[in-house]
Amino acid sequence: MSEARLFTSESVTEGHPDKICDAISDSVLDALLAGDPKSRVAVETLVTTGQVHVVGEVTTNAKEAFADITNTVRERILEIGYDHSDKGFDGETCGVNIGIGRQSPDIAQGVDTAHETRVGGAADPLDSQGAGDQGLMFGYAIADTPELMPLPIALAHRLSRKLTEVRKNGTLDYLRPDGKTQVTVQYDGTTPVRLDTVVLSTQHADGIELDSQLEPEIKQHVIDAVLTELGHQTLDTSNPRILVNPTGKFVLGGPMGDAGLTGRKIIVDTYGGWARHGGGAFSGKDPSKVDRSAAYAMRWVAKNVVAAGLAERVEVQVAYAIGKAAPVGLFVETFGSETVDPVKIEKAIGEVFDLRPGAIVRDLDLLRPIYAPTAAYGHFGRTDIELPWEQLNKVDDLKSAV
């Protein structure tokens, strides 16, 4: 029997101020990609009481979408559910300030004509697109769940999605968009054995009693519903500690309660702290930015490695130099869970996956408006939407390569 340990991950709803910003940035990105798939986009958003500020750099031929950014912003805020001043924010009446310039020509030079082409004379078209920045990105997969994600973050996301669902479908019509969930799981070694604690904080209308209404209804319609659907083989969910709105009241929320920024929930977006993170955020960035596209590719790699049975869990790191197509480094960690030599796994990854930025964009078909749905509830292991980096299309190739 291994020593019991507790691990915690959190999620937030789409109405959290930081997630509003991620959603706005990705909605602008999608609108521009729909009009011009080759758009270069780096959009950051800030929200605060009554105001939205959208700034960054864009180079695009999608002139109509660019001119309509203000409406794109308002529509996404209203879709999230901030449609009245009673909720602390209103997409119809809030101020929207746009401050967007063009992408730096120095950066564009390195992306458009990579070092391999510019200096080395490479003829392969995939050698012509360089990485949009230097950096390191991680991907991870583990056999904790059917979606090959760590259980704590997977469960936290399910709770957040359910919280939004019962708000939007009217089951609990007094809920407001802002909310957070947190899950603590007890592990025996690497096996999740017991759900220890669930923390759920949700914005609500004024006058709602915590003990007599909010807590029992959240437990019934959100927590119990999610745990019933979970059906995990090793996890005991029979008696968790449940904390609903432990401050006692959560009426003031959204941008009125806290300012929000794009890219401030990078652990929520990825693996809930279970795996390492290279530091780069995703939302508002087109796929020429390896912060986003290479992190997606690493998840694709890791998920296929685990699905192929080469390891029960794997973390893969890739690194790039700005303006260069080929990665400068690849690192594979299997934490002793491998079924074949890790050196063979690393070699097989190099043979099966082309990790040049242009190849990633091609193989995952990333020049499409597919990003707005990823802005909340995680970019990986999604069970509610289909994402190209979640496909298991390289399993047989990996098995053959090792």
UniProtKB/Swiss-Prot annotation:
PROSITE patterns: ADOMET_SYNTHASE_1 (PS00376), ADOMET_SYNTHASE_2 (PS00377). Pfam families: S-AdoMet_synt_C, S-AdoMet_synt_M, S-AdoMet_synt_N. InterPro entries: ADOMET_SYNTHASE_CS (IPR022631), S-AdoMet_synt_C (IPR022630), S-AdoMet_synt_central (IPR022629), S-AdoMet_synt_N (IPR022628), S-AdoMet_synthetase (IPR002133), S-AdoMet_synthetase_sfam (IPR022636). One of its GO terms (cellular component) is cytoplasm. Residues 103-113 are annotated as: Flexible loop. It is found in: Cytoplasm. This is S-adenosylmethionine synthase. It comes from Mycolicibacterium gilvum (strain PYR-GCK) (Mycobacterium gilvum (strain PYR-GCK)).
